[in-house]
A protein has these predicted regions:
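Perimembrane helix-loop-helix junctions
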Residues: 145-149, 155, 168-194, 201-202, ...
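Short periplasmic/luminal acceptor-recognition loop of GT-C membrane glycosyltransferases, typified by
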Residues: 369, 373, 377-415, 434-439
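Specific aromatic-rich, kink-prone transmembrane helix
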Residues: 89-95, 112-115, 131-150, 154, ...
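Signature aromatic-anchored transmembrane alpha helix within multi-pass, membrane-resident enzymes
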Residues: 5-10, 153, 170, 190-194, ...
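Membrane-lumen/periplasm interface segments of specific transmembrane helices
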Residues: 15, 185-262, 287-290, 343-350
Length: 478
């Protein structure tokens, strides 16, 4: 293995060491993914579509579940899978950039991805982005090497980790045709790559009664977020924000320095049709589609996690712009890129406020707002095995990581966010503990007492953003 590649991998591993040990599962729906995988691991079987895997790709859940069975620890299993995917992603991006733009471009692309705060977070939690990116880049490298069938298999697998992988099937087909001018091979590639998606659509039609059930769920969620943005900022401002969202997000995901250099290099390569220009098209055509939906149709709200492919492929072209800088400026640029993950971590770790909540989704370490972890620890330390715990839902979804971090068995929870079986669980068990969180639906977490359907709870421990209540002692008056 070449020394520059080893250096890039060493940087990547070092940057992920602390987050993988000290971070928390939160963004990328990591807690839910791990819980679903853990259920599957108890009884491995063919997923029954949306009824069991919800909106998540079944391959990612299966891989986590298999590692849970092998290792016995759900968090270790999920993080080991993500770390492997993260390091493979750095290695594969190096190989893609080396093939298209040379050794220097390969080194800087790999180093930039190693410093990417979002990629660090995805490599150190149970989220799916690092695994997806590794499969995507593996498929791309094989396609560039004209190993069409293997490339199609990997891209098909990527689409079963994250459904946005399906968008790249026709784009890869077009890429192969542009490079090889062999229509039959391009069509064969698309057929093989699309087969897993078609099978999964059939599974959903068979068991859920709707082939597109997972996609409809995702569309509903993003349409709701888009409406919330329009209501909050106004239609015009929301459209303008969505119009520039993708390039601005890339400048955060890839660090501001390398993100900007990658964008400049990508524009130059596309305008001059330099080697690799077609990779720019593969990276940015999906971005154009999502931008159209967000800015024109107002039915989609983009997230930084969606930009990881565009950011990674743009880094292939960062070296050209970096090479134009004088040596002191280059050193300063690299130092700024290395400092970006640390700065984002300091903005949100154990902090509250608007800046902390802005930084948290893209920071290198998975973090929770202060008080949520403490509340989870209190519940874990004080809940008895016969306690039934009522857990409030939250518009910030803080109930999900709180329950996950506590490690309390699922059967003890009565979670208001679980609309499907909330009433059934209440009918079976009377809650003896309750946890209210900020912006919850059941009650005000700042109050000393909490009345739920005639059951009176008294505050046992208060935290920032959450309060734990226990059933009031007999004879307690309101």
């Amino acid at each position: 293995m070449k020394r520059p590649l080893l250096a890039a991998l060493g940087i990547a591993l070092a940057a992920r060491a602390a987050p993988i040990v000290f971070g928390y599962e939160h963004y990328g729906d990591a807690p839910v993914r791990i819980e679903l995988a853990e259920r599957w691991a108890q009884d491995p079987h063919l997923w029954r579509g949306y009824l069991e895997s919800w909106q998540y790709g079944p391959l990612h859940l299966t891989l986590i579940g298999a590692l849970v069975r092998l290792l016995g620890d759900r968090v270790v299993a999920a993080r080991l899978l993500s770390l492997t995917g993260g390091l493979l992603g750095v290695w594969l991006l190096y190989r893609v950039a080396e093939r298209e733009r040379g050794l220097d471009a390969a080194f800087w692309a790999a180093v930039a991805l190693a410093f990417s705060p979002l990629h660090i977070q995805a490599s150190a939690t149970g989220a799916s982005e690092a695994v997806f990116l590794a499969l995507f880049l593996g498929a791309l490298l094989l396609a560039l090497r004209e190993q069409v069938i293997l490339s199609a298999i990997l891209l098909g697998a990527a689409g079963l980790v994250r459904y946005d992988g399906w968008l790249y099937v026709p784009l890869f087909g077009a890429l192969l045709w542009l490079r090889q001018r062999n229509l039959a091979r391009s069509v064969a590639f698309c057929a093989v790559a699309a087969a897993p998606a078609l099978f999964w659509l059939w599974v959903n039609a068979r068991f859920a009664g709707d082939a597109l059930a997972p996609l409809r769920h995702i569309d509903r969620d993003h349409a709701m977020l888009a409406r919330m943005a329009a209501d909050s900022f106004g239609s015009l401002r929301a459209r303008l924000q969505h119009l520039v969202y993708w390039p601005l997000a890339v400048c955060l995901v890839a660090t501001p320095v390398f993100g900007l250099l990658g964008l400049l290099g990508s524009v130059r390569a596309l305008r001059r049709l330099e080697p690799g220009w077609d990779l720019v098209a593969v990276a940015w055509l999906p971005a154009a589609y999502f931008t159209f939906r967000a800015a024109i149709l107002l039915d989609f709200r983009p997230m930084a996690r969606f930009t990881l492919v565009a950011a990674s492929l743009s880094l292939v072209f960062a070296h050209e712009a970096l090479a134009r800088l004088r040596r002191p400026a280059r050193a300063l640029a690299v130092a700024a890129a290395a400092a970006t993950p640390l700065a984002l971590a300091l903005m949100c770790w154990n902090r509250t406020g608007a800046i902390a909540e802005w930084a948290r989704p893209i920071a290198p370490i998975g973090s929770l707002p202060p008080g949520i972890v403490e509340a989870a620890r209190w519940v874990k330390a004080n809940a008895r095995s016969d306690d039934a715990i009522l857990l409030d839902g939250s518009t910030y979804y803080l109930d999900i990581p709180l329950a996950f971090a506590s490690g309390i068995p699922e059967e003890q929870w009565i979670r208001s966010a679980w609309k499907g079986d909330f009433e059934q669980r209440l009918a079976r068990k009377t809650p003896t503990l309750a946890v209210l969180v900020v912006r919850g639906s059941l009650g005000d977490f700042t109050r000393e007492r909490f009345d739920f359907r005639g059951l009176l709870f008294c505050a046992a421990q208060r935290f920032t953003y959450a309060t734990v209540y226990r059933s009031c002692a007999p004879g307690h008056t309101r």
